[in-house]
Each structure stands twice: as structure tokens, then as C-alpha cells.
Amino acid sequence: MKKMSKHIVLSFAVSSLLFSQAYALPQGGKFTHGTSGTIHTSGNTVTITGKGQNHVIQWGGGFNIGQNESVNFTTSGKNYLNIAYQKDASKIDGALNGGNNNIFLVNPMGVLIGKTGTITAGKFVASTTPLNDENVKTFLKQGASFSPAFDVSKQGNIINLGKINADNIVLIGNKVEIKKGKITLDVLKLEGNKVYVDAGVVKDTKNIVAKAEQEVIIQQSITSFEENGALLGNSSSKFSFDDSSKVKNWTKYGSIADATEWNKFADFLECK
């Protein structure tokens, strides 16, 4: 009996591992709402080619990209609305190669871009706001200019730890966090109940627009502080806030990570 139980446990563990590996790429994708195209999966790569200008893809098995895996949008200058159906946040640990296409990813449970995750696109939008048919029709009319409305009641978070390279980025969720990684773009729009930004991550951004219902925090390491000419939250000079008077808590602070940064901080105090 003991040997059998061990075999059952081992079999379950192996099957669970195989199941998780099998679903590390987007699953169950179908073009809907009158749009069309092809979705081809080969090994660790999904290739998507739309046949029109605006496309809607509903992913019945969720939208995730595992480490060392990739999703490639092969067209140029097109718009793709990806709607993920899953019980947890979409995890981007691999490569989302959008080229100069505009990529929208909607998952009410959230979107997590991991440390190994990379995204390239003309415009990238991640949102936790559920979309109804009227919203989708609006996307089909507006294309790249479409932006989901913020729903304060949804608890899904948008968190970035990876690298995003796009001309325009829009992140909408309960809590929007840009904690690590690198973001290179012209315009960054953040909207949520709470917005947390590491200023060092967005230092190359030309324009940042934030809207928060409850709290805004801009954090900056001492190293980044030094690189930005001893200006705390140098990127904050690029921030503009919608309805900023409604924000209950507004904070800017510098952080010290190790002994090297302590020394830099001490040198700064001596100079003062």
C-alpha cells in the first residue's frame, strides 16, 4: 500500500507538472466579433496573423507566456484586443513580440509582467476592466485610440517587473505597480486605486499621466537619485495627475538598498 500511494502521489505530481507546462502559452484563442486571422502554435512559440485592421481574440484557456516562450504578432500597424479568461492573473515571463502593432490585454484578474518578461509594441495596454459587447464594438471603431474605462470595484492588479518597449503604454487596474525592470516609451498612462512607481524605471519616459483614487507613491533609489542630478523623483516633473486633489495620500521617497548606496547618501549629505 505504501508503494502504491507513493506511485499515485508521484504520478499526480508529474501530471500536474505536465499540465502547467502545457498551458504556459496562450490557449483556446479564437478571433471573434467578425474579425479573422490565424493562430499557430509550434513548440514554445505562438504566431498570430490578423487579416484586417482591428482584431478581437478571446482566449478561453487564458493568456500567459512562460519563460523562454514567445508570442509573435506578424502584421504591421494593426490593433489586437486580447481578452483572457482565467482564474488568475496573466503572467508574462517570456516575450510578447508585438512589433509596431498595438496590443491590448484585458484580464479582470490582473496582469503580471515578470523579471524575465519582455514586451515590444507600438502601443501596449493592460487592463483589468471587463469588457461587454458595446465596449468591444467601440474598440472595433476606435482601434489604437481605444482605452478601457477604469472600474474601481475590480481587484486585479497590474504589476511590471520586466521590460516594456513601446511608444505608448496604458496600465489600468486596482493597484498599478512599476517596481523594477525598464520601460522605454514616449507616453505612460497609469490609472488605478493605487499607483506605485519606481522613478528610476521610467526615467526615459517623456510624459507620464497618472490617475489614482486613493494613493500615489513615487520611489527612487539613491543611485537613481544621483544619476538624475540629485533630484528626488526627477521623473515626477514629467507627471501630470488627473483629479489629483482627490488623491488621499501622495508620497515621494528615496530608498537605500545596500552599503554602496549608504556611502552615496553620506557623500550627498556632506556636499550639502
Residue ranges and their predicted role:
Residues 257-271:
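Short, low-complexity, Pro/Ser/Thr/Gly-rich segments in the mature regions of secreted, periplasmic
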Residues 10, 19-21, 227, 254-256, ...:
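Short, intrinsically disordered, low-complexity terminal segments
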Residues 8, 15, 221, 235-237, ...:
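N-terminal leader/targeting signatures
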Residues 1-23:
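Gram-negative bacterial Sec-dependent N-terminal signal peptides
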Residues 21-243:
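Solvent-exposed adhesion/ligand-recognition segments of exported proteins
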Residues 225, 239-241, 253, 265-268:
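Aromatic (phenylalanine/tyrosine) cluster motif
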